[in-house]
From Swiss-Prot:
GO molecular function terms attached to this record: ATP binding; ATP-dependent DNA damage sensor activity; damaged DNA binding
This protein's encoding gene: radA
SMART domains per UniProt: HhH1, HintC, HintN
PROSITE patterns found in the cross-reference section: INTEIN_C_TER, INTEIN_N_TER, RECA_2, RECA_3
Note: The intein interrupts the ATP-binding site.
Stated family: Belongs to the eukaryotic RecA-like protein family.
InterPro entries given in the database record: DNA_recomb/repair_Rad51_C (IPR013632), DNA_recomb/repair_RadA (IPR011938), DNA_repair_Rad51/TF_NusA_a-hlx (IPR010995), Hint_dom_C (IPR003586), Hint_dom_N (IPR003587), Hint_dom_sf (IPR036844), Hlx-hairpin-Hlx_DNA-bd_motif (IPR003583), Intein_C (IPR030934)
Keywords: ATP-binding, Autocatalytic cleavage, DNA damage, DNA recombination, DNA-binding, Nucleotide-binding, Protein splicing
Pfam families xref list: HHH_5, Intein_splicing, Rad51
PTM notes: This protein undergoes a protein self splicing that involves a post-translational excision of the intervening region (intein) followed by peptide ligation.
Name of the molecule in the record: DNA repair and recombination protein RadA
Record PANTHER family: MEIOTIC RECOMBINATION PROTEIN DMC1_LIM15 HOMOLOG (PTHR22942:SF30), RECA/RAD51/RADA DNA STRAND-PAIRING FAMILY MEMBER (PTHR22942)
Function: Involved in DNA repair and in homologous recombination. Binds and assemble on single-stranded DNA to form a nucleoprotein filament. Hydrolyzes ATP in a ssDNA-dependent manner and promotes DNA strand exchange between homologous DNA molecules.
Amino acid sequence: MMIMVKKGSDPEVVEIDEIEGLGLELEEESTTSKKKKKEKEIKSIEDLPGVGPATAEKLREAGFDTLEAIAVASPIELKEVAGISEGAALKIIQAARKAANLGTFMRADEYLKKRESIGRISTGSKSLDKLLGGGIETQAITEVFGEFGSGKCFARDTEVYYENDTVPHMESIEEMYSKYASMNGELPFDNGYAVPLDNVFVYTLDIASGEIKKTRASYIYREKVEKLIEIKLSSGYSLKVTPSHPVLLFRDGLQWVPAAEVKPGDVVVGVREEVLRRRIISKGELEFHEVSSVRIIDYNNWVYDLVIPETHNFIAPNGLVLHNTQLAHTLAVMVQLPPEEGGLNGSVIWIDTENTFRPERIREIAKNRGLDPDEVLKHIYVARAFNSNHQMLLVQQAEDKIKELLNTDKPVKLLIVDSLTSHFRSEYIGRGALAERQQKLAKHLADLHRLANLYEIAVFVTNQVQARPDAFFGDPTRPIGGHILAHSATLRVYLRKGKGGKRVARLIDAPHLPEGEAVFRITEKGIED
């Protein structure tokens, strides 16, 4: 170091000045090295720049209790929960990303190696697993839509009881279809047609609680079949349904059994006829009918089905409980299996928006797969979402449960949202509300992606379909959610009914897989080839 001094200056002063200057330089170097050292030693939230004890406490209370959680947050989120400026929030996030090694570039071969650690949950069907690249992926959102018109239908003369604004109607399901088709029009769907319903309510039995209540019917569906199963009861009633249609029996408790498997001597469960006719609906008013005969009959005509989103059944005027469509419990059982059997040794979180979760179905699948039904049920955590805000809140609360089970022998490995869009669709009606709905849905999907990536879990969502009025060719339906959901879901699978009671899954979008189809069946074991 060189210091310029005046002539005649004391050399000792120069020396001292040089030493002081040198000390200043050493101090600067020491400060720089300390800064670097400090940056390298970020191991907790308090180590982040600008985060003191008070801010750290606010972040933890809001669920941002790890560097990874902060790294994937948005500046606006941190600004709101911590009461800091957006600029300060951005600096905190950037430091967290650097400390957690997120947001940096990685060579493709290294990324490929990282993807080898991704877990997959078997669906129970080898053909469907192959279509999905090995099963339902962790760190991804898999969307399934189009499960509608499942082939579980009734003969055209089946009587139905329904209400419009408390005005009762009792007529055949064929007459009901014709009436609403003339008002609302019918849409081609799968092997038949569907008519949207508005302000139509039926009485339904909640199997889980045993309660009878009034609920909304969303669609009425029809298709043609050649043969039906006729089930005659000792009370004089009879059912004419397709072979795969579930019938509510009393076999070691209440359970749904496909019509083709019903035998003489079985007991069909219904609701007391006089209770329904007086419209005095109360809990526990059940009656039982013994099956006297079961036979296959030639039919070659239209069969019909009502779509009941909430409980998937409705009560006919004769008191019999009639089932409609229901699926998606298999994964909740399969994920609990060890990896060598297609699972991930994991627990399940199920966010239920339409009251579609059925523990009875879980028990049936688990029992037929040789598992302890009670143990399987213990590792499924269910919450009912009553509106879109509640649904989004439950995703945030799900993170608490994920953290709670993180270091146990059954960490959460599957998050199910059934259905993803039903509340958004019913609450935000019309073009004027579309922008707000899509923004809210985008935030919801971002939260799901964050959980999937941060905790290495699989997110499985079901979706509804709607008609495309401008579609003159091809499939006239499309999934709800628009471009927001189309671009956010990692894999999109379209389900439709095939011939002979089989189902067809079509992979329509995936970043690493070709489009294709797989055929599978729904049995007492869930999904099978």
